């Protein structure tokens, strides 16, 4: 039944849900995934990045995922390491995020926000939109960066026994989704609606976070609504699974590059105790480059460049 739903949704299309023009990635693009739990948990699956890679396999594109559980457009999850009994505030997190993003020099940024902010209620929608505008202006590099907005995921009614609470959560998420759609339209950026197509699918681990099937369906929706070209090979093929494993490993290496487990010794309150620890994250760079080379070589073997 779940697979049938996946097939039906992948075939469903409407002008309302699609961008006016098709979206494309070009040679040399640096694609960034920025947001909260949606993107951090995507690291475990790799479906979205694989879908994009297979559709632009003859282009040399770099992907970086800096999603952070619980993050908001205000940078709440990205505050500095603890200094004695004090954590940094959201503004510090926002500035750290901006600095990190600029260092990566992205040309395309996929944004996933709204879920965490929605717990503030519908009354906080104006503040959310203001924060979103500020984020775009801060990271947009005077129009040089192309953005893609993703809506929040829906909540599953099967995991919420109280119908009234489910109705309230759904209404709130829809309000934040419409805010995202409005800002995207105002700034003329693509918007991908994940609320409506995924509303009735059993695609989550707990009613909130997507599982592997969920991320596969999400990748299908992104491709459909952005009118992406067909993949060079089917995403369910054995070769695609090999590619997905390569992508997951590369993303794991980059995760440890920018978010080391010994954060306190690298960036936080104990960084003066073990200075050698501050040099260790950069050592992941060579492994990341090597893994990306494997990915490009594998793509050439299954999808040679078009003449």
Which residues does each predicted region cover?
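Serine-esterase "nucleophile elbow" of acetyl-processing enzymes
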Residues: 6, 13-70, 74, 97-105, ...
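Structural recognition of the beta-strand scaffold that forms the well-ordered cores
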Residues: 30-34, 62-67, 107-113, 146-151, ...
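Solvent-exposed loop/turn segments at secondary-structure junctions
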Residues: 37-41, 68-74, 108, 115-120, ...
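Mature catalytic domains of secreted/periplasmic carbohydrate-active enzymes
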Residues: 41-69, 73-78, 82-87, 91, ...
């Amino acid at each position: 039944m779940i697979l049938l739903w996946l097939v039906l949704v992948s075939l469903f299309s409407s002008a309302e849900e699609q961008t006016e023009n098709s979206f494309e990635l070009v040679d040399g693009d640096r694609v960034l995934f920025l947001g909260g739990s949606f993107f951090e948990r995507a690291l475990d699956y790799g479906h979205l990045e694989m879908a994009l890679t297979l559709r632009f396999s003859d282009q040399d594109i770099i992907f970086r995922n800096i999603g952070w559980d619980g993050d908001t457009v205000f940078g709440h999850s990205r505050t500095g390491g603890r200094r004695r009994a004090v954590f940094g505030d959201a503004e510090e997190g926002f500035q750290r995020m901006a600095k990190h993003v600029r260092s990566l020099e992205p040309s395309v940024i996929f944004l996933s926000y709204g879920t965490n902010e929605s717990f503030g209620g519908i009354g906080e929608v104006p503040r959310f939109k203001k924060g979103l505008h500020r984020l775009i202006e801060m990271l947009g590099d005077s129009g040089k960066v192309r953005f893609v907005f993703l809506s929040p995921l829906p909540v599953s009614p099967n995991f919420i026994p109280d119908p009234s609470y489910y109705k309230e959560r759904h209404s709130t998420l829809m309000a934040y989704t419409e805010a995202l759609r409005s800002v995207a339209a105002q700034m003329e950026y693509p918007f991908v609606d994940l609320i409506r197509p995924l509303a009735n699918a059993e695609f989550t681990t707990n009613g909130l976070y997507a599982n592997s099937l969920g991320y596969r369906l999400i990748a299908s929706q992104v491709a459909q609504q952005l009118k992406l070209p067909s993949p060079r090979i089917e995403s369910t093929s054995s070769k695609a699974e090999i590619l997905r494993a390569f992508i997951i490993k590369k993303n794991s290496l980059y995760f440890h590059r920018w978010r080391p487990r010994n954060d306190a010794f690298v960036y936080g309150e104990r960084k003066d105790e073990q200075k050698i620890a501050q040099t260790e994250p950069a050592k992941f760079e060579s492994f990341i480059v090597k893994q990306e080379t494997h990915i490009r070589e594998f793509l050439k073997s299954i999808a040679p460049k078009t003449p």
